[in-house]
Each structure stands twice: as structure tokens, then as C-alpha cells.
């Protein structure tokens, strides 16, 4: 950092607040920018960028943009333009990259020239990815108080027919996500303008596209009138700019994903471009909890728990949600005392508006910590605070998972039934089937699972749930194998489905093939681990006379928070070894074309 300071480089107060400090209070030094990103240290990241030569920064067009955003956060728009190589004059800057020109339109808005910024935006935003140029214009129009023009933008972006995805793997989900963004913002703007009936009518377009989610949509539509759970503030220039930047970051991430998939690849590892973009956005709008949560989630997914906790704990104002996020990261990082303290603090500052959502997070973390008494004390309050059917269904769903974790399977099944009664969706039915299976009500569970398969024959996770149930809760191994083979065909890169299919092979005695498939599932999940995959590998290694590897896998399973009932069984295996006999090898079931028939569009 000293080299950058010597060259006249200065950080904004927002950036300085993100600095990770060593025990002596000095900023941590990093060997390369990626290390600073993984620590959630925007100050360290920008310092390394500033220390590069101009030629080095030009290797990535966003490096100068991030430094420019920090200058903008400090109120120095002239310094921001200097990093972008802009003069602020349209005639002088016309050869600059389109993204830089788009940034310049927002710099004009930050300077207070909103009408000029809007005109500039309309001139330069045509090359922005996807619909981000239009969304950005709508945000700028609203920040300028030109709400009717912003509404017209949203109207133009809304299609006449809205089609929801059939399942999680349906590519239509990408389109639906963009449409949902448009409709939600349209609806919220109308609500801010006091046009409640129109706001509800717009939002109902999403509800009509997903009739099975009627309970959740009804609660959301009602909140547009009551304001419950709705923090709907008018956009300012800074919050509008941050929103537009976030849209661009998401769109570019989606483009990278689609391009990789089209080339036969798979998205793996830490997305440093999205992380650096989001951390820079937080310089403009540090209080934006949605963007902050996205950064935390990205770091968490890559097992960068220290970085996730740091980002959660360095917000300008703390909140119960951020404390719960910090607690989760601290827990997974091995600091259980600090995690418990963060949970306690989150509950202590939660008010009536966020008490229910805080309880959701606190309960799940108490379960992972095996704090049974504390968890059971919170369940009645959770159920009492839930008011509308959507909240009550969610509360019963959480209660079911808590009781399930601690082995109270009958109580868990009862709450899962209540959740389904209140909110009869595919997700609730699948959770109920699992709870019934855990409670020994196998036939009732199978009725649900088979019905869901008939309704969603090309949903890989529905097939996975049925197939895995058949091989673990019944003796219908052959049928389970065939169902899982179809799931694999539809989602061959999904590690959880690969684990299930591998376990079907194990049950049929093909242990070597099972090992290879489940080991690949483990590798695909890295740097995360899953207790069930490790537990499966432990059993496989034991039967292959790899006793040390088996014990190591079971130990890893225990470190990754299995349910209590499974924890007891794994601990017994660690102590006494595996007592169940090696599965007898059987001929693998023949799979007909009918079993695997899948339309190409479904793949």
C-alpha cells in the first residue's frame, strides 16, 4: 500500500472501511489481487491495481473501472474520468470503450446533471449486455424524478406472454429471471408512487405464470398494500447507479456461463470478475445488503469463510441478516463460540419487521451447532409470529427440518404436512415425502414421489429424489437404478445426482464403478464437502479394504454437520468399523430406450 500512496493514490473512506488488518493493526499485504478478493478486502485489491503500470491495467478493461468507481465513491468524478481516460466531452471521448462511456453518463448524474446524463445514456448504452441498458435508463430516470418515463421503459420490456421454467435445470429460467426483475421493479415503482392497485396488477403477471406458487405470490401482492416486509425506498443517484452496476455484473456472469456451456465446459471455481465487480459496487452503495449478501454467498460457496465473515462484519450498519451470515461463515470456519455469539446478537437486535426471518436463520444454525435445547426453544416463537399462509408454511417447513435433524421424525412429518396444507407446491410435497420416509411411512412417501415424477418427468432432481428413495428406503434397487440413470442423462454434471447413481451401483454390488462416480462427485464439490458423499465413500473404501481411507472419509463426514441420527451411525462406524456385509454383485438392470427417452430440448 505504501507504493501506491507514494504515487498519489488515495482510497475512498468506503474502501478503507473494508481493509483487513493484521494483529498489529496494519493493513494486510497481498501477493496478488485475487488473494485480496478472496479475503473480501477491497482496499487491498484496489491498492494492488493502483500499483500496476497503465499497460498492466489495460490487460483487463475493468481494472481502471474499479479504480474509477472508488474515486466516484469519494466524490471525485474528475479523478474517476482520469482513470477511464475520459474528458467528459462527447466529441473527445467517442472512441472510448462503450462501457466507459456508460459509466461516464452515471458520473454526469453524480455531478448533478441528470438531464444531461439521461441524454448521454441514451446515446451510449445500446451496446450494454442484454437488457441492462434499458434497466439502467429506468433507474436513472427514476433518480431524476421522471417516473412516468421509467414506467414506460418497464412496460416496453414486459412480454405479453410469460413462461415460467418447468424445473431448476430448464434454460427458460434465465429468461424468466430477467422478466421477473423487470416486473418486480415496475411493481415497486408503482407502489412508491402510491398506485397500489396498478402495482398489484403488474406483479400478478408473475403469479399467473406460476400458479402453483399462489400462496407465496399472494403474500407478496398483499405486502404491496400493507408495506409488510417491504423496504421500498425511492432510488437516489447513488443507489440507482449501484443497481445498474449490479445488473451489468449479473448479465456478464450469465454471458460467461452460457458461452462456457455452449462450448461444452462447466463453470467451476471462484468467479473473481463478479466478486471484484460487486465489491466495487459496494463502494458506491455500502448499505446495499442485497449486493453484500451476494458477495458473502460467493465467498462462502468457495469455502472462503474468513472473507465471507469479513464482508458481513464490515457493513456500515449491521443487521440481523448480516449477523446470521457472519455466524454461518464463522461456524464453517471452525469458530463455534463466535458463531454462537453472532446468533445471539442477531436475535437481540431483530425487531418486529425482521424477527421472523432472523429466527429462520438462527434455527438452522442452532441445528448445525447441535444446540438442541436452544433450537427447540425458538420453534414455538417462530410458529407464533408467522401470520399469513406463506409465512406459516415456511415456519412449519423450518420446524420440520429442525425436528428431522434431531431425529424427532414423527414431529417432523407432522410439520411437513402442515406446510404442504398451507402451501401445496412441488417443493413442499417433496419435503413431505422425505419426512414421511424418515418416519417409516414408506408407501405414503412413494405415492407422493411417483405422482411428482408423473407431473415432472424431465426434472432431474425429482427423478433423483425418487430414485435415491427407492435404493435407500426400499429393496427396489433395479427400479431406482433406472430412474437415476435418467436423472444422470438429464444432468450428468450434477454432483448430487452422480452420488445417488453411484450409490445405486454400490447397492447392486458394482463397488469399483460406484467409487469412481462418487469420487468424481466429491471432486466436483470441492472446496466444499458434503457429509453424505463422504459417508458413502467411507463405506466403499471399507469394503475395498482401504480402512484408513474409510475412517478419514467418515471423519470428514462428521466435520460437515450430518443430522444427529446419521452422526450417531457414523460415529459407531468410526469406533467399530462397518458391520454391514459387502453388497452382493448383481447384473445391472437393462435400460430400454423408453427408460431413457429424453427430448433434446430437455437436455
Predicted regions and their residues:
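Alpha-helical segment of the N-proximal tetratricopeptide repeat
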Residues: 2-11, 28-41, 241-277
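Residue-level recognition of tetratricopeptide repeat
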Residues: 34, 69, 106, 139, ...
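Terminal, low-structured helical/coil segments at or just beyond the last alpha-helical repeat
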Residues: 232-251, 531-536, 543, 548-603
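Solenoid-like repeat scaffolds
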Residues: 16-25, 50-59, 85-95, 121-130, ...
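Register position in tetratricopeptide repeats
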Residues: 38, 73, 110-111, 143, ...
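TPR-repeat structural position
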Residues: 9-13, 42, 77, 114, ...
Amino acid at each position: 500500500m505504501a507504493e501506491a500512496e507514494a504515487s498519489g493514490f488515495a482510497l475512498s473512506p468506503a474502501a478503507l472501511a473494508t481493509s483487513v488488518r493484521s494483529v498489529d493493526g496494519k493493513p494486510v499485504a497481498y501477493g496478488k489481487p485475487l488473494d485480496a478478493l478472496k479475503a473480501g478486502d477491497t482496499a487491498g485489491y484496489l491498492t494492488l491495481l493502483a500499483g500496476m503500470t497503465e499497460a498492466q491495467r489495460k490487460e483487463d478493461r475493468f481494472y481502471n473501472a474499479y479504480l474509477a468507481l472508488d474515486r466516484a465513491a469519494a466524490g471525485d468524478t474528475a479523478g474517476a474520468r482520469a482513470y477511464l481516460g475520459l474528458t467528459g466531452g462527447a466529441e473527445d471521448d467517442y472512441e472510448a470503450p462503450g462501457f466507459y462511456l456508460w459509466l461516464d453518463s452515471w458520473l454526469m448524474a453524480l455531478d448533478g446533471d441528470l438531464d444531461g446524463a439521461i441524454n448521454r445514456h441514451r446515446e451510449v448504452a445500446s451496446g450494454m449486455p442484454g437488457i441492462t441498458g434499458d434497466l439502467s435508463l429506468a433507474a436513472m430516470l427514476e433518480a431524476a424524478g421522471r417516473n412516468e418515463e421509467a414506467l414506460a421503459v418497464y412496460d416496453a420490456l414486459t412480454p405479453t406472454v410469460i413462461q415460467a421454467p418447468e424445473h431448476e435445470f430448464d434454460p427458460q429460467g434465465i429468461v424468466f429471471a430477467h422478466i421477473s426483475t423487470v416486473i418486480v421493479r415496475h411493481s415497486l415503482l408503482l407502489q412508491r408512487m402510491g398506485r397500489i392497485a396498478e402495482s398489484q396488477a403488474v406483479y400478478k403477471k408473475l403469479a399467473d405464470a406460476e400458479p402453483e406458487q399462489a400462496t407465496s405470490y399472494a403474500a407478496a401482492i398483499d405486502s404491496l398494500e400493507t408495506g409488510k416486509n417491504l423496504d421500498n425506498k425511492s432510488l437516489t443517484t447513488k443507489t440507482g447507479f449501484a443497481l445498474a452496476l449490479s445488473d451489468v455484473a449479473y448479465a456478464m456472469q450469465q454471458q460467461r456461463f452460457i458461452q462456457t456451456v455452449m462450448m461444452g465446459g462447466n463453470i467451476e471455481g471462484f468467479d473473481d470478475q463478479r466478486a471484484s465487480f460487486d465489491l466495487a459496487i459496494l463502494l458506491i452503495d455500502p448499505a446495499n445488503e442485497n449486493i453484500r449478501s451476494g458477495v458473502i454467498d460467493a465467498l462462502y460457496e468457495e469455502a472462503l469463510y474468513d472473507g465471507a465473515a469479513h464482508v458481513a462484519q464490515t457493513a456500515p450498519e449491521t443487521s440481523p441478516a448480516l449477523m446470521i451470515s457472519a455466524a454461518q461463515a464463522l461456524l464453517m470456519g471452525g469458530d463455534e463460540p463466535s458463531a454462537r455469539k453472532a446468533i445471539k446478537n442477531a436475535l437481540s437486535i431483530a425487531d418486529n419487521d425482521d424477527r421472523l426471518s432472523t429466527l429462520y436463520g438462527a434455527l438452522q444454525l442452532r441445528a448445525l451447532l447441535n444446540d438442541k435445547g436452544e433450537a427447540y426453544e425458538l420453534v414455538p416463537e417462530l410458529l407464533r409470529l408467522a401470520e399469513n399462509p406463506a409465512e406459516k408454511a415456511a415456519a412449519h417447513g423450518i420446524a420440520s427440518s429442525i425436528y428431522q435433524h434431531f431425529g424427532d421424525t414423527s414431529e417432523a412429518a407432522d410439520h411437513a404436512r402442515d406446510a404442504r396444507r398451507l402451501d401445496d407446491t412441488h417443493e413442499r410435497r417433496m419435503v413431505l415425502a422425505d419426512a414421511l420416509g424418515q418416519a417409516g411411512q414408506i408407501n405414503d412417501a412413494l405415492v407422493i414421489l411417483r405422482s411428482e415424477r408423473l407431473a415432472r418427468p424431465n426434472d432431474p432432481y425429482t427423478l433423483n429424489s425418487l430414485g435415491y428413495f427407492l435404493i435407500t428406503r426400499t429393496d427396489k434397487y433395479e427400479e431406482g437404478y433406472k430412474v437415476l440413470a435418467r436423472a444422470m442423462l438429464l444432468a450428468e454434471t450434477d454432483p448430487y445426482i452422480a452420488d445417488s447413481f453411484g450409490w445405486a451401483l454400490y447397492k447392486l454390488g458394482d463397488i469399483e464403478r460406484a467409487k469412481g462416480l462418487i469420487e468424481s462427485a466429491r471432486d466436483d464439490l470441492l472446496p466444499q464437502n458434503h457429509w453424505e458423499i463422504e459417508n458413502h465413500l467411507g463405506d466403499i473404501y471399507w469394503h475395498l479394504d482401504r480402512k484408513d481411507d474409510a475412517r478419514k472419509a467418515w471423519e470428514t463426514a462428521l466435520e460437515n454437520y450430518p443430522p444427529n441420527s446419521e452422526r450417531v451411525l457414523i460415529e459407531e462406524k468410526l469406533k467399530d468399523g462397518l458391520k454391514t456385509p459387502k453388497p452382493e454383485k448383481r447384473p445391472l438392470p437393462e435400460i430400454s430406450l423408453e427408460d431413457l427417452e429424453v427430448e433434446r430440448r430437455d437436455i
